[in-house]
Amino acid sequence: MDMQHRIRQLFQASIETKQQALEVLPPYIEQASLVMVNALLNEGKILSCGNGGSAGDAQHFSSELLNRFERERPSLPAVALTTDSSTITSIANDYSYNEVFSKQIRALGQPGDVLLAISTSGNSANVIQAIQAAHDREMLVVALTGRDGGGMASLLLPEDVEIRVPSKITARIQEVHLLAIHCLCDLIDRQLFGSEE
């Protein structure tokens, strides 16, 4: 097996998926940034959730807002619902793993807040329940999905935003999700604090 050849194949596949995403995602990423900025300007916050790699993405996004992205600026209110192991395990034990995010949203979410819901398949049951809870709390939803959008896509309201990666391969979807998250962080900073150029 030629490992360097395989590495080149993987790089090329990632590049091609990003090129395909570039053709379709910019308006949705822009709209998502506007939704998030509007919430932040109106004293709202952004909650985020996902499983596995998507949980890591939720935490990555939250940390970029709470700390900083690529410039010095005030901290922005963002909470990853994936980080408190005591809360997650108590809900999973006493109720169901499908409720680990929705119960947190019912406690922490307020009208005007935004939920960043991340799932490569769009079919994660606990993320689907998180979207339902967010709507119950009069929150808007930004969904990062892939494939056909799954069950998440069918739950979204007209004012919500879906950023659906045009791929069926989990690794490629995750790579574009990370790029979309970095785009959102950049656009949020620019809209709130101006361009550094």
Swiss-Prot record:
Membrane in keyword set: no
Keyword Nuclease in annotation: no
Keywords: Carbohydrate metabolism, Cytoplasm, Isomerase, Lipopolysaccharide biosynthesis, Metal-binding, Zinc
Pfam families per the UniProt record, alphabetical: SIS_2 (PF13580)
InterPro entries found in the cross-reference section: GmhA/DiaA (IPR035461), Phosphoheptose_Isoase (IPR004515), SIS_dom (IPR001347), SIS_dom_sf (IPR046348), SIS_GmhA/DiaA_subfam (IPR050099)
Gene3D superfamilies: Glucose-6-phosphate isomerase like protein, domain 1
GO molecular function, one term: zinc ion binding
Cofactor note: Binds 1 zinc ion per subunit.
Superkingdom, natural source: Bacteria
Entry-linked CDD domains: SIS_GmhA (cd05006)
SIS domain boundaries: 36-197
Signal sequence segment: none
BP GO annotations: D-glycero-D-manno-heptose 7-phosphate biosynthetic process; lipopolysaccharide core region biosynthetic process; positive regulation of DNA-templated DNA replication initiation
EC assignment: 5.3.1.28
Swiss-Prot/TrEMBL catalytic activity: 2 D-sedoheptulose 7-phosphate = D-glycero-alpha-D-manno-heptose 7-phosphate + D-glycero-beta-D-manno-heptose 7-phosphate
Cofactor field: Zn(2+)
Residues binding substrate, per UniProt: 51-53, 64, 93-94, 119-121, 124, 174
Gene Ontology CC terms, in alphabetical order: cytoplasm; DnaA-DiaA complex
Misc. comment: The reaction produces a racemic mixture of D-glycero-alpha-D-manno-heptose 7-phosphate and D-glycero-beta-D-manno-heptose 7-phosphate.
Its biological purpose: Catalyzes the isomerization of sedoheptulose 7-phosphate in D-glycero-D-manno-heptose 7-phosphate.
Protein name: Phosphoheptose isomerase
Species for this entry: Pseudomonas aeruginosa (strain ATCC 15692 / DSM 22644 / CIP 104116 / JCM 14847 / LMG 12228 / 1C / PRS 101 / PAO1)
Organism taxonomic ancestry: Bacteria, Pseudomonadati, Pseudomonadota, Gammaproteobacteria, Pseudomonadales
